[in-house]
């Protein structure tokens, strides 16, 4: 098990840490969860909650963490927790990049903070939408791919692919040649870059993507064969 070291400025939750050997790997002791994921999380039905503190999950003390990837607004970690005096390990992943929808996967159970707010969409499908709602709009996909919590559905006739994280839409692709467009701008993968620049705000050091919405929390990236909508640049 090899530790994934983080770039400078990322993974600031590894504070005051020491490193020890654990299960043929390395564990960061005295670590904390990032403040972005602390607080209350709820499952999709609202019947189950999860409470995360800087050094605890539902009251179980955080004893260390390993296999750290990313950090802050998007990351994953294996957390060693003390539950009734015994050490248990849970994999925790999260994506809280958007203020409109936030997702945390604890083990195999996803939890959410959903507002329902969005700016851009494709045929009514928007970032933060539930998987079942996509099925109701588009039916069963022609192809399914990925491994939970990262799944994707492809619709060949529509020329659209939908990407999910923890059962929530986290990306929408419109392929070249598709007649589908973004609902607000009416643009698609065949639209010229100048049309995107006229409707959306350019972002990035080289204006390599566009942002949408009042809070500029939705990102649109253009490629030769597709255009992508997501909570961050592709």
PLM segments and residue spans:
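Amphipathic/hydrophobic helical signal segments and adjacent flexible N-terminal regions
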Residues: 3-7, 11-38, 108
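N-terminal helix-cap/turn-to-beta initiation motif at the start of protein domains
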Residues: 22-42, 53, 123-127, 131-132
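Beta-sheet ligand-binding and adhesion/scaffold domains
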Residues: 25-32, 44-47, 78-116, 214-222
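Short, solvent-exposed coil/turn segments at beta-strand boundaries
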Residues: 35-38, 51-58, 73-74, 95-102, ...
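N-terminal glycine/threonine-rich, aromatic-flanked beta-hairpin/loop signature
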Residues: 43-88, 173-174
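Short, recurring structural edge motifs at helix starts
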Residues: 118-124, 180-185
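A cross-family detector of function-defining hotspots
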Residues: 129-180, 185-234
């Amino acid at each position: 098990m090899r530790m994934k070291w983080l770039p400078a400025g990322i993974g600031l939750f590894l504070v005051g840490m020491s490193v020890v050997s654990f299960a043929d790997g390395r564990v960061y002791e005295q670590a904390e969860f990032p403040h972005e994921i602390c607080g209350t999380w709820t499952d999709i039905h609202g019947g189950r909650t999860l409470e995360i503190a800087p050094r605890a999950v539902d009251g179980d003390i955080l004893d260390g963490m390993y296999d750290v990837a990313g950090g802050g607004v998007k990351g994953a970690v294996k957390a060693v927790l003390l539950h009734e005096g015994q050490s248990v390990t849970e994999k925790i992943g999260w994506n809280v990049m958007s203020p409109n929808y936030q997702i945390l996967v604890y083990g195999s159970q996803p939890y959410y903070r959903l507002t329902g707010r969005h700016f851009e969409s494709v045929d009514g499908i928007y970032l933060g939408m539930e998987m079942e709602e996509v099925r109701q709009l588009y039916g069963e996909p022609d192809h399914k791919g990925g491994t939970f919590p990262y799944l994707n559905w492809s619709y060949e006739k529509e020329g659209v692919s939908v990407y999910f994280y923890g059962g929530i839409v986290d990306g929408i692709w419109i392929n070249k040649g598709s007649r589908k467009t973004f609902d607000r701008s009416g643009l698609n993968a065949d639209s010229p870059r100048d049309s995107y620049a006229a409707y959306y705000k350019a972002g990035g050091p080289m204006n390599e993507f566009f942002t949408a919405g009042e809070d500029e929390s939705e990102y649109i990236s253009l490629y030769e064969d597709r255009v992508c909508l997501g909570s961050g640049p592709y």
